[in-house]
Amino acid sequence: CIDTIQDDVLQDAARRFVPRIHEYPHMMRGTGYLCSLINHDANIIAKGGANGVYGIGLKKERIGISFKIKDGTEAVWPLIIREIFRQIGYYNADTDKMLVSLNNGVTVNDNDTPVGEVKTVFTLEKHF
């Protein structure tokens, strides 16, 4: 939440640059990546980091979310984000469709035959 930044210079920079993220989301990482695609949702500021770390801010809800995938993989990020959004009651049809397009949970072999699935099996705990 920009209004909680106590440093005036940093707060001013955030006010100027956050809208640019939504205007040019591909600059976050490049085309076709979660970090770029999710920032099309004007209510979200999100960025992945090293070793499977991901951070998300929901502006209107004033919620910050972060998680880390122990083995560092990024492939499951869309599944995890979608489940987090489901559990907290956040829904944007375009964002949901994009998350499913990146990973729908179905594992396929080289012949595109489904051979398994990945499911999220966690329940969020509130810490505030």
Where do the language-model regions lie?
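Structured C-terminal helix/loop/strand segments within mature extracytoplasmic catalytic/sensor domains
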Residues: 3-128
